[in-house]
Amino acid sequence: MASVLLAASMGAQADTVDITVTGKIVETTCKIDNAANSAMTVDLGSVGVDAFSGAGSVGNSKPFELSFSGCPTGADGIANINIAATGTADPIFTNGFASTGDAKNVAIEILSGETAMTSNGGNAIDVVPGEDGSAKAELTAAMVQVGDTAPTVGSVNSVVTMNVTYS
């Protein structure tokens, strides 16, 4: 038995892999103008339960933007701002973010144009700073009915973290 194990181990091959790690240090990153203390609130206001008409229907929505300034420009500047949303996914409406409020059958959706940003960072968006070092990401927050049952009366709240990376 020992000779079989020895013969098997002698035939084993080992490989090595060289990994090159790269990066870049820039003068500074951009300033997010409308996020005081790294937080902002998008108030969707109040909406009646009769505004929802079935699964996936939007009861209320509101455009908002992330404004960037002071982005370094030029050869060593920031060429791209990548924004990915993360948070707790709604268990039924997986494109939406779960609400922690007491209203039921409703989720929050963050859209860039017609595309929903998903809670796992999917459908991230890219924004390119202008020559003046500024950029805007135009987004929309929406209350969305989850499933066939109409939302119940109550508050709707969700925390969505916008992960911003620069390249």
Predicted regions mapped to residue ranges:
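Gram-negative bacterial Sec-dependent N-terminal signal peptides
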Residues: M1-A14
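Mature extracellular/passenger domains of Gram-negative fimbrial/pilin and adhesin proteins
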Residues: G11-S167
